[in-house]
Amino acid sequence: MSEAREVFLRARGRSFTSFNKDAESQWKGPFYFIQGADPQFGLMKSWEIGDCDYGGDEWEQEIRLTEEAVKAINKLSPKPKFFVLCGDLVHSMPGIEWKEEQEKDLKNVLQKTHQEIPLVFVSGNHDIGNAPTPETIQAYCDSWGDDYFSFWVGGVFFLVLNSQLFFDASKCPELKDNHDRWLAAQLAIAEERKCKHAIVFQHIPLFLQKADEDNDYFNIEKSLRQEILQMFLKAGIKAVFSGHYHRNAGAKYNDLDMVVTSAIGCQLGKDAHGLRVVVVTEDKIVHKYYSLNELNTNGLDQELVDLLKTK
């Protein structure tokens, strides 16, 4: 059990143990990773019956879909550098009776991911609560590893943030202060190192369609959003990958690509259950959303494969 448990606890000490910083801080050539979001075990039943608070007592559909996702990822060649899940791992909020069982079933599926593909976890509102507390954040960390951390892969700097602290930190102000100080220090590293690319993962999008859009449940509050965007631009962040919306969305803001990826689980729009493939080359970041069926059947597009061969 300890070996299986370790798969889910690689984010610790604000870093990620699968990648050695010294070995990974230099550019080595193009690579790719897989981004998924919102497997959210239990939401499909909840949504179907119109009880999103307490209706999530069944999650067979989400188990099957996540199994499809893992199967598709395991087939890919060459293998992705990692598989990141951008939050809402399960639907039950902290304190809801099915949470522990949902997490157990999700882990049973995810541990079938090929051992050479590390799993990176991002906390979402259903993982730590809409207004998280020190206790809900600690429970998440005990189960999935640190709620925020950074790591290097092939000369690219990755930041995993706890976006719920941007949304409502009223019950954990000290933890928000710690997160803010850490983020400022990481952005200073990104700016100083002038790394090949710097990329952020968080659950809640900064915005869905345009940077000055109105406040919404699915984005970050406008004045804070503008502050974060300016910080990210100054540090040279090239892309922010998120979930939360259960639909594909996003847009460019100056040089920053805000990417909103639809769900592995319940769809709230017209997208198919799917995953995003992200190719990182020396001069650009290229991404495409695939349905689970499409990725399982056909694998990567030749266009993306060709990008991986560029020098």
From Swiss-Prot:
PANTHER family: METALLOPHOSPHOESTERASE, CALCINEURIN SUPERFAMILY (PTHR43143), SERINE_THREONINE-PROTEIN PHOSPHATASE CPPED1 (PTHR43143:SF1). CDD domains: MPP_CSTP1. Binds 2 divalent metal cations. A divalent metal cation 2 binds at D88, N125, H244. This is Serine/threonine-protein phosphatase CPPED1. Residues 47-250 are annotated as: Catalytic. It comes from Xenopus tropicalis. Protein phosphatase involved in the dephosphorylation of AKT kinase family. Its EC number is 3.1.3.16. The keyword Repressor does not apply. One of its GO terms (molecular function) is protein serine/threonine phosphatase activity.
